[in-house]
Amino acid sequence: MKPENTKQSSFYKRLFALVLPMAAQNLLNALLSASDALMLGLLDQSSLSAVSLAAQVQFVFSLVMDAAIIGTTILAAQYWGKGDTRAVEKIQANTLRISCAVGAFFCIAALTVPQLLMRLFTPDEELIRLGASYLRIVSVSYLFGGFSQIMLCVMKNTGRTLRSTVYGASSVVLNAALNALLIFGLLGFPRLGIRGAAIATSIARFAEVLLVLYENRRFKEVRLRLTDIRHGDRDLFRQFRRHTAPVLANEMSWGLGVTMFSVIMGHLGSDAVAANAIGQIVKNIAACFCNGLGVGAGILVGNLLGAGKLDQAKEEGGRLVRVSAVSGIVSGIILLVCSPLVMRFAGHLTGEAQGYLRFMLYVCCYYMIGKSVNGTVIAGVFCAGGDTRFGLICDTVNMWCLIVPLGLLAAFVFKWSVPVVYFLLNLDEFTKMPAEWIHYHKYKWVRNLTNERGAEST
């Protein structure tokens, strides 16, 4: 076999060993959301709409957690590639101090002011009442998630991707099973409806915490130590803060923009809300491999950069861009083929909501291409080398200077139809591509961050 073919074979072997387990877990998570929607939809359309809007609180929480996870991946992948396991332990402890505080904040907010949170997304009193009851119960899951998600992230970055997937998948399966039992009152359990879905989520998150604590005792190379949590590492914290602050700002800027999408759709009627809820679930299912590819790209390139293999990282970054484009196209085609099947499962919606959903599914097909490429390049390749400021600038300008104003004008000034508004809101992944392409070829992301430790304080 030629050296070039051997190199490519090694690349794809390492890539798919990372991506396939994560894609499988993403798929399970998306299917869980789909099962939630299906079960709640069988109750009534109001329950489905209320939970989809209440889930925006979880979405904002996930934005903060995603920033912490990306920041952890940036450093953990590079230090693991270098072979410095003690640094990885300290990175894990530093991040947990932050993520657990974030989880506590969201828990308190969802527990004490759920009606206020719901009013941000809809004026409908019935949806506010139902959503508030859901938020009160699910609030404790933010505490558990703040801990378990960082632990699972470190597992992915330290050669335990498959085990991380098994733990995450176990939590998802438990959640789905409890949903069925508690929403409908099967096998002698009480019929709790929307409250049952919240209880199931909280129990599943707690089970996930127990699993990662077991893993912490089992795996000897990287352990969570109480001394690291109490004292921390100032140099690593400064390095984490430097590279994570732009990611957090980027996640919040982009995420609040996407939340504005829900606000806009929420004020266009319950039919638009219900169709958008199912459309978002289907979009998430279709993007499972694309999202896994983005995370895998960050780990793969980060390991190489940390090991000092800058030329190889640059070469494999190019391969990842090409793979991401193909991944997006294939995902879009699969979604197009499966669209009629999705419509059959949406028979409980009103006729108008079904019409909206049919159009939304077509939009999601081409959306996958931009989603895949941007997720791999901006959140994966760029972040692997600590090049996080570009994403902040690009997403903020794109979202708040173009897409959100365009959506607001279309919905509330020009009074355009729901399909037109939805189409405009889903241009965000494509309008930033030219700037992203130019920045990629500057190669500012080709950096070994482990050589910069200690320089943050100077």
Q: Residue ranges of each PLM-predicted region?
A:
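N-terminal transmembrane alpha-helices
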Residues: 6-38, 42-43, 56-71, 75, ...
